[in-house]
């Protein structure tokens, strides 16, 4: 009898795990790590992002537009504070030298609920020292002025502007909402191939 109960329990547990996997898979593509936290830290260093909107001359914290999953809601209306063209960000780094990258995933949701991932290229302007590799892996890598890929800065500008002229809004239909995940992560120097799964830096 005990054996039968245990077997039944195993079947129930497997079913629950399968259900969770199905539900979670619709959102799994939207994160580059198992955690939705914006910060990634190790004992020897810590990195984080300061995300805000530049409304004219006023710097407005983006926290007001951040949901429980760490995603920022962006507006397509130029008159709104959280217009995607107003998005700005800095990256902070503390501790030992590290290789740093920022992963950016955009979620476009149509009026009928259909979700498209990174459907429209968003032409942010990145500060000097950053390499835009989003076409390949949705990430922007810190290259540094010497292209060494080693970050020793305390605070570095990341998103500094938006190229309105090259933004193709023709594919955007009425009722679309946009959210973005900005996730900073870092690895010890010389360990990025194992952790990030790349043989060399994208600019090499």
Locate the predicted segments by residue.
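Surface-exposed, hydrophilic segments of mature proteins
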Residues: 29-204
């Amino acid at each position: 009898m005990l054996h039968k109960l245990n077997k039944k329990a195993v079947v129930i547990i497997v079913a629950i795990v399968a259900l969770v996997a199905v539900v979670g898979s619709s959102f799994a593509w939207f994160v580059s790590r198992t955690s939705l936290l914006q910060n990634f830290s190790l004992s020897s260093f810590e990195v984080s992002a300061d995300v805000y909107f530049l409304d004219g001359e006023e710097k407005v914290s983006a926290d007001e537009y951040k949901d429980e999953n760490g995603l920022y809601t962006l507006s397509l209306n130029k008159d709104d504070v959280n217009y995607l063209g107003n998005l700005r960000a800095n990256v902070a780094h503390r501790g030992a030298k590290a290789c740093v990258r920022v992963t950016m995933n955009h979620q476009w949701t149509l009026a009928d609920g259909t979700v498209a991932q990174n459907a429209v290229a968003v032409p942010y302007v990145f500060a000097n020292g950053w390499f835009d590799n989003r076409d390949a892996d949705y990430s922007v890598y810190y290259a540094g002025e010497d292209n060494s890929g080693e970050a020793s800065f305390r605070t570095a500008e990341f998103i500094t502007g938006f190229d309105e002229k090259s933004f193709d809004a023709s594919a955007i239909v009425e009722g679309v909402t946009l959210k973005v995940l900005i996730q900073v992560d870092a690895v010890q120097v010389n360990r990025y191939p194992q952790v990030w799964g790349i043989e060399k830096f994208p600019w090499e």
